């Protein structure tokens, strides 16, 4: 097993751990889930660039008759990228004392101000940071509003 294979295995394990945490552990942390709202995906161009680079690496490895293990590891990495970029949907998860946004726990008492932009983006102002929540379905903004009013 070469250094390249070890690095690929480490990346695959890290992506698997992230996917497992995002799908199974995070919804169970910090109490019962009151609402989970799917968000719009960001970074489509980044996903295509990453997939293209992986395709180039797989092609080069096959054409130069590289190690079969490396080819398989690159294919597994491509499958993980496909899951993370195209199948998994980002979401905001509301709990009784706070919410998860981009896998970060934010308590409700940290919210200083909330606004809704004209294009349907919920802007949540924290102490030193602004969160831009772009929901997939515009009707979910009303559900978010009801949860915020109920829990505050």
Curated annotation (Swiss-Prot):
It holds the Pfam family DUF986. Keywords: Cell inner membrane, Cell membrane, Membrane, Transmembrane, Transmembrane helix. InterPro entries: DUF986. One of its GO terms (cellular component) is plasma membrane. Coiled coil: none annotated. It is found in: Cell inner membrane. Its main location: membrane. It comes from the Bacteria. It is a multi-pass membrane protein. The chain crosses the membrane at residues 6-26, 45-65, 67-87. Belongs to the UPF0266 family. This is UPF0266 membrane protein Ent638_2389.
């Amino acid at each position: 097993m070469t250094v390249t294979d070890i690095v690929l295995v480490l990346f695959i394990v890290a992506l698997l751990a992230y996917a497992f945490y995002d799908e199974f552990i995070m919804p169970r942390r910090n109490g019962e889930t009151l609402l989970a709202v799917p968000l719009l995906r960001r970074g489509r161009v980044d996903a295509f660039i990453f997939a293209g680079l992986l395709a180039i690496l797989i092609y080069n490895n096959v054409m130069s008759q590289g190690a079969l293990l490396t080819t398989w590891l690159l294919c597994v990495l491509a499958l993980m990228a496909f899951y993370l970029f195209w199948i998994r949907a980002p979401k905001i998860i509301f709990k009784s004392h706070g919410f998860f946004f981009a896998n970060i726990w934010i308590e409700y008492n940290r919210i200083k101000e909330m606004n809704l932009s004209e294009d349907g983006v919920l802007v949540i102002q924290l102490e030193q940071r602004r969160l831009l929540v772009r929901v997939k379905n515009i009707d979910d903004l009303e559900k978010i509003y009801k949860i915020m009013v109920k829990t505050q």
